[in-house]
């Protein structure tokens, strides 16, 4: 408070017997001396004595201390803010080489696994071909399908094994898309950016998990997590089953077509179908290839129902939080009845009658043989899958029946989205250029030959690698001359090609995959389509709260190891319910492709070729400057 060597600060009379002198002392003390006494008496007082300090001095002292405390707090706050930034930078410096090392190790392990087999497989194939074994040739042709060889980090990786290839095909494609971009950036549309923004806003600490950079580009971890969640949307998490819902759906469609054909033959008095009908399937894979024909027959009967068509179940009779009934395998009576697919299957005998619906006494007069209780799906499952040795009894497993109906409805939506699609448009209009990501033949389907109504001889045109939207020169010349105008009407040809060249190989490699596992983009369309009215691109991400919750759970799976089964089921089954809601609404729309066009653009879909790739892959990467 006082400097060294300052003059006295105050003189005052003390009790009339002398003057006191206030001197400055280096020790910040006040020395008060009596000047009239021969031997001055010194009294030392500290500065904080109230009787020596005025009110102003105390206030000034407290203000100085307050300012000093504020300065110390500001310095501490600055250090506290800087510490997480420095720690995050250090963590990123540590995580980047670790992630690169993990990806490298996974790639090396995958290569080692694949390179161990090709020589043996190739020798076996050559032996079969030399012996004239047609099955070996067919196996080779299947391995050359478009989904077998992909380009990853500049190297060709043959996907030989089921459990290492097709099961992770979609996730590996995302990794490959980011790797193929090099130093550039890839964008996936505003829909993925909206999902990332919502996830960052609703979940603390997600920036570190996703590794989001300051430029706001879409995280590869987010895209992979979204693809995993979309693929699981139609899966049943409760119970163990020998058959998937996709397999049950294909068998139901097969039986429905067989029953309809039998009824038509009985009415016409013919012993065989017309020449335009395809040959009946003798194996399950042949039945998969004929699904577009089965769907066409089903759609004809749906149109005959006029206004009494509903693609929704009775939610009042279904569990509110879970897909499967608690401690049971059956719903309340009549829960599935409003759905048009259920009603048609029931009318054709695809779903057998049960004791809850009718008794033997009630149908004895009209059906003395009780044929209504016959279960054709159980017999068909044993015929298609004799090695499983257990029949598929849908009437005893209503959650699987519900999932099978959902699978049929998803196929119907897929057919409507792809109907009359034109993959021969100008390839420069495509947002997704497949040639940048796939190696080998990247070709679209061609028009069926004369007499090949159901695409038995559909194949690639044999041109070198190119984007699938490129039109073959011969077809382009025919169109310009006017002779090929009918080729523009593709009908279901692209769907036939997709089931033959994409879905069959994928099912062969993993026969437990559901419809959303084959077409994750179809699940995304259903989730966005659950909003009433025409969805807008700005609100495309707002209606996916269930998707956000499951993505958050997937990304935090290492932190949520203690989460109960009820929590996982609730979060997962919420997205299944939203998918069912969107599916029922989209199937009720007259022109679903036009209805969803604004949202599809938010998903990077501009052309029919983009739409087909998005339905199969779940995302469409394209090169951008700012992701």
UniProtKB/Swiss-Prot annotation:
Per the UniProt entry, what is one GO biological process? viral penetration into host nucleus
Per the record, the domain of life is Viruses
Q: Where is this region: Interaction with major capsid protein/MCP?
A: 1-56
Tagged with keyword Thylakoid: no
Quote a single Gene Ontology cellular component term: host cell
Q: Where is this region: Disordered?
A: 458-480
Q: Which InterPro entries match?
A: Herpes_UL25
Where in or outside the cell? Answer: Virion; Host nucleus
Chief place where the protein resides? virion
| SUBUNIT field | Heterodimerizes with CVC1. Interacts with major capsid protein/MCP and triplex capsid protein 1/TRX1 at the pentamer vertices. Interacts with the large tegument protein/LTP.
HAMAP family, per this entry? HSV_CVC2
Q: Which function does this protein serve? A: Capsid vertex-specific component that plays a role during viral DNA encapsidation, assuring correct genome cleavage and presumably stabilizing capsids that contain full-length viral genomes. Participates in the interaction between the capsid and the tegument through interaction with the large tegument protein/LTP.
Identify this protein by name. Capsid vertex component 2
Q: Which gene encodes it?
A: CVC2
């Amino acid at each position: 408070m006082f400097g060294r060597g300052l003059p006295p600060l105050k003189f005052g009379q003390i009790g009339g017997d002398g003057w006191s002198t206030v001197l400055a002392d280096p020790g910040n003390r006040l020395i008060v001396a009596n000047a009239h006494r021969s031997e001055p008496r010194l009294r030392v007082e500290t500065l904080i004595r109230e009787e020596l300090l005025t009110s102003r001095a105390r206030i000034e002292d407290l203000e100085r201390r307050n300012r000093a405390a504020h300065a110390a707090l500001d310095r501490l706050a600055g250090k506290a803010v800087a510490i997480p930034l420095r720690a995050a930078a250090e963590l990123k410096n540590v995580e980047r080489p670790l992630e690169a090392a993990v990806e490298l190790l996974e790639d090396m392990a995958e290569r080692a696994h694949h390179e161990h087999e090709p020589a043996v497989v190739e020798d076996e194939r050559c032996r079969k071909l030399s012996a004239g074994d047609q099955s070996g040739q067919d196996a080779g042709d299947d391995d050359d399908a478009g989904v077998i060889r992909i380009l990853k980090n500049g190297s060709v990786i043959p996907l030989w094994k089921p459990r290492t290839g097709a099961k992770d095909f979609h996730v590996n494609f995302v990794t490959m898309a980011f790797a193929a971009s090099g130093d550039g950036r890839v964008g996936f549309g505003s829909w993925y950016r909206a999902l990332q923004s919502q996830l960052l806003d609703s979940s603390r600490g997600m920036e570190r998990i996703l590794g989001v950079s300051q430029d706001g580009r879409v995280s590869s971890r987010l895209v992979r997590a979204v693809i995993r969640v979309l693929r699981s949307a139609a899966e049943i998490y409760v119970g163990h089953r020998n058959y998937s819902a996709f397999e049950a759906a294909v068998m139901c469609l097969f039986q429905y077509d067989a029953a309809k054909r039998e009824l038509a033959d009985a009415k016409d008095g013919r012993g065989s179908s017309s020449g335009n009908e395809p040959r009946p399937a003798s194996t399950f894979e042949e039945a998969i290839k004929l699904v577009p024909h089965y769907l066409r027959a089903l759609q004809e009967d749906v149109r005959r129902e006029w206004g009494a068509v509903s693609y929704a179940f009775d939610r009042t009779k279904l569990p509110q939080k879970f897909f499967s009934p608690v401690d049971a395998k059956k719903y309340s009576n009549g829960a599935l009845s409003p759905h048009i697919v259920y009603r048609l299957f029931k009318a054709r005998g695809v779903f057998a009658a049960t004791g809850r619906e009718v008794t033997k006494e009630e149908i004895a007069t009209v059906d003395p043989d009780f044929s209504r209780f016959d279960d054709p799906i159980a017999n068909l499952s044993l015929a298609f899958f004799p090695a499983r040795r257990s029949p598929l009894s849908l009437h005893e497993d209503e959650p699987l029946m519900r999932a099978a109906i959902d699978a049929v409805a998803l196929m119907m939506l897929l057919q409507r989205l792809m109907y009359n699609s034109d993959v021969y448009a100008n390839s420069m209009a495509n947002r997704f250029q497949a040639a940048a990501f796939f190696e080998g033949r990247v070709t679209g389907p061609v028009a069926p030959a004369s007499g090949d109504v159901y695409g038995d001889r559909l194949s690639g045109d044999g041109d070198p690698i190119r984007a699938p939207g490129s039109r073959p020169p011969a077809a382009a010349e025919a169109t310009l001359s006017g002779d090929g105008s009918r080729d523009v009407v593709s009908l279901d040809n692209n769907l036939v090609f997709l089931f033959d060249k994409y879905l069959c190989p994928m099912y062969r490699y993993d026969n437990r995959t559901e419809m959303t596992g084959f077409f994750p983009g179809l699940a995304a369309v259903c989730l966005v389509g659950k909003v009433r009215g025409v969805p807008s691109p700005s609100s495309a991400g707002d209606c996916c709260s269930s998707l956000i919750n499951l993505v958050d759970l997937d990304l935090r799976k290492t932190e949520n190891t203690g989460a109960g089964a009820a929590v996982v089921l609730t979060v997962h089954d919420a997205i299944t319910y939203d998918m069912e809601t969107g599916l029922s609404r989209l199937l009720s729309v007259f022109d679903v492709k036009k209805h969803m066009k604004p949202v599809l653009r938010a998903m990077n879909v501009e052309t029919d070729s983009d739409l087909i790739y998005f339905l199969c892959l779940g995302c469409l990467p394209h090169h951008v400057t700012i992701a």
